[in-house]
């Protein structure tokens, strides 16, 4: 069978189901595909197909994730669902599944549970910008007041983590009944997708963001100058554009791009995803190095101190065998280079065990171009022992 061509006519949005174990995330994912399949906008996927998620590796960490895709009238969606709680933690922290919004599934019969809270916190820490709530298993609750109560609890919990609890859409439904083809509950799935369509904005495309390229390599061309190579992470770059070289030094250096090459051919414009070489005016070979970034002036700044949400690998994942404490000094790998940093654990946290998910403060020995949401790995002697996401810049 020929591969279907990917039609890019509708805007693309990445979403996922989050919430406590057994509250119905995977059943809901199956129900969405099944209901939309009846409208010819998806391929119906059974619960078992989604639940048997393949393992993937992201930054040396093994994560099981199921990917489904479907369309609504307005959009094309890529949807992730994870079988286990640990998979969510790893997924969100490594950015393996970057979500533009999430559907928080809460069982109306049980109300918010510990992982409900943890997934909301993670969403806040790693920058999932919007949440829509699906109160599931409403067919099992006859008491209207109880439903109101659970809804209030969920809204309060969202507000506690700085989401707009009062504005978040809450849809009351039953994923299982919808999956079984019960029309009144199928309608709730349609209602949910309308809420997702309307409430979660179309994300800004990577190309439309300000230009940034992590420097991977640097070389000189006699008579022409210095070339920095790398993959454009976001934005576009044209010949004549001003850029700043940021990181590893106290002051960013300003320069102008006098040439852009890709596969040894000259380009008018490079964009997000392209591997390029950028010729930099008036920059000597030793003024730019791997680990720095080229960026649109003023769009990103170098920092040394930040808070981060971190997942620490287990021994089985190739991580540490022993806990670590405050003042631990591993390497922090940002984009293309390692920088030593000193870890301070939050008050009341004595030590961190392999397999833990923790917030920490990090102070790097050299400044790096970072912003909220920047992902990194923690390494020790060349092996990955943790993965993190910057949650707050301190200085």
From Swiss-Prot:
EC number from the UniProt entry:
3.6.5.3
* Residues that, per the record, bind Mg(2+): 26
Q: Where is this region: G4?
A: 136-139
Q: Please report a single Pfam family linked to this protein.
A: GTP_EFTU
Q: Where is this region: G5?
A: 174-176
Q: Its Gene Ontology molecular function terms?
A: GTP binding; GTPase activity; translation elongation factor activity
Instruction: Cite the residue spans of the region called G1.
Output: 19-26
Would you say which domain of life the source belongs to? Bacteria
- Catalysed reactions listed for this entry: GTP + H2O = GDP + phosphate + H(+)
SUPFAM superfamilies per the record? Answer: EF-Tu/eEF-1alpha/eIF2-gamma C-terminal domain, P-loop containing nucleoside triphosphate hydrolases, Translation proteins
In its keyword annotation, does this UniProt entry include Signal?
Answer: no
Q: Where does GTP bind?
A: 19-26, 81-85, 136-139
Name of the protein described by the UniProt record: Elongation factor Tu
* Source organism of this protein record: Geobacillus thermodenitrificans (strain NG80-2)
- Gene name as annotated: tuf
């Amino acid at each position: 069978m020929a591969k279907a061509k990917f039609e890019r006519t509708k805007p693309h949005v990445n979403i996922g189901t989050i919430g406590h174990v057994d509250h119905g995330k995977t059943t809901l994912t199956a129900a969405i595909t099944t209901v939309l399949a009846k409208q010819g906008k998806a391929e119906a996927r059974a619960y078992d197909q989604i639940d048997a998620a393949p393992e993937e590796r992201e930054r040396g960490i093994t994560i099981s994730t199921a990917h489904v895709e479907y369309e609504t009238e307005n959009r094309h969606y890529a949807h992730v669902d994870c079988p286990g709680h640990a998979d969510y933690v790893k997924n969100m922290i490594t950015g393996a599944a970057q979500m533009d919004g999430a559907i928080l599934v809460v069982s109306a019969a049980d109300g918010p549970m510990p992982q409900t809270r943890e997934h909301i916190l993670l969403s806040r820490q790693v920058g999932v910008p919007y949440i829509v709530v699906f109160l599931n298993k409403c067919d099992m609750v006859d008491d209207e007041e109880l439903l109101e109560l659970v809804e209030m609890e969920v809204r309060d919990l969202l507000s506690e983590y700085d989401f707009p609890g009062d504005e978040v859409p809450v849809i009351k439904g039953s994923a299982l009944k919808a999956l079984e083809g019960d029309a009144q509950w199928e309608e709730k799935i349609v209602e949910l997708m309308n809420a997702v369509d309307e409430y979660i904005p179309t994300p800004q495309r990577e190309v439309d963001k300000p230009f940034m390229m992590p420097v991977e390599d640097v070389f000189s061309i006699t008579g022409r100058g210095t070339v920095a190579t790398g993959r454009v992470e976001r934005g576009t770059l044209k010949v004549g554009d001003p850029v700043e070289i940021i990181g590893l030094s106290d002051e960013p250096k300003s320069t102008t791009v006098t040439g852009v090459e890709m596969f040894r051919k000259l380009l008018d414009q490079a964009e997000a995803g392209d591997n390029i070489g950028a010729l930099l005016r008036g920059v000597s070979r030793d003024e730019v190095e791997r680990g720095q970034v080229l960026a649109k002036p003023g769009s990103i700044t170098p920092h040394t101190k930040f808070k981060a949400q971190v997942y620490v690998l287990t021994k089985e994942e190739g991580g540490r065998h022993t806990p670590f404490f405050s003042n631990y000094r591993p390497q922090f790998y940002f984009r293309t280079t390692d920088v030593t940093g000193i870890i301070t654990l939050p008050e009341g946290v004595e030590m961190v065990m392999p397999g833990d998910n923790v917030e920490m403060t990090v102070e790097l020995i050299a400044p790096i171009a970072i912003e909220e949401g920047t992902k990194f790995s923690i390494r020790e002697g060349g092996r990955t022992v943790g993965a993190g996401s910057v949650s707050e810049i301190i200085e």
